[in-house]
């Protein structure tokens, strides 16, 4: 207790989570097992989750290690140290509940008089995804791979024809290793054909022009004028009184289609009614006629 200062932010996390009705927000305790340790309560994992994001520690494995060696976490979790599987599953299963908790936190800030609720600024930030460029596919990329497979298969078949001719002058024992190697190559091409046929089907079933196989919602995005990365475009809305974030949402679209949705969600989080006016500041990347019209119709100017 003495090793955690009274003004340490970890105490705010502890007090805030302890006051929440987590079940009402949608957080569920893990299923009890007949053997092994009892499951962790959602408040333990939620405190760990928030601590990780506050201190820029997102990896489940790193959080597991921090639970053991970090004094602040030892205090916050009362000596408990969940494994990385439990931490990762908690995040995966409670996406909607975490959004509800964020809205409740914005309400808490408003009740504390920390929000002006008259002016917000909206801007986007690019965050690199776990998904690599290698595992991001467009129609052009799939076509390129399928064409390569087709050409490689034709080459293998030509080589088999040549081996048939060689058997007339060479023994079967001399030719067979080459034939086996070609057949192995054809089997690998068959597997790759199935892979890219499945990717093509996924691409056909989405309205986007690309798919990502690791982070499904991430997209290939222009980060700067010449650098493209597989990333998320995170929209943030900040209240002007104390520069506190009142809305955040990871998207895969560009800024031009994001203003109305970000501003509307921020207005809801601020507990403002549709007829209440809200000034929204944004750079020229958001200035599309349809988005501005939608905002104006809902008293966001």
Label every model-predicted segment:
Residues 24, 52-56, 71, 263-270:
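Structural motif corresponding to the C-terminal cap of alpha-helices
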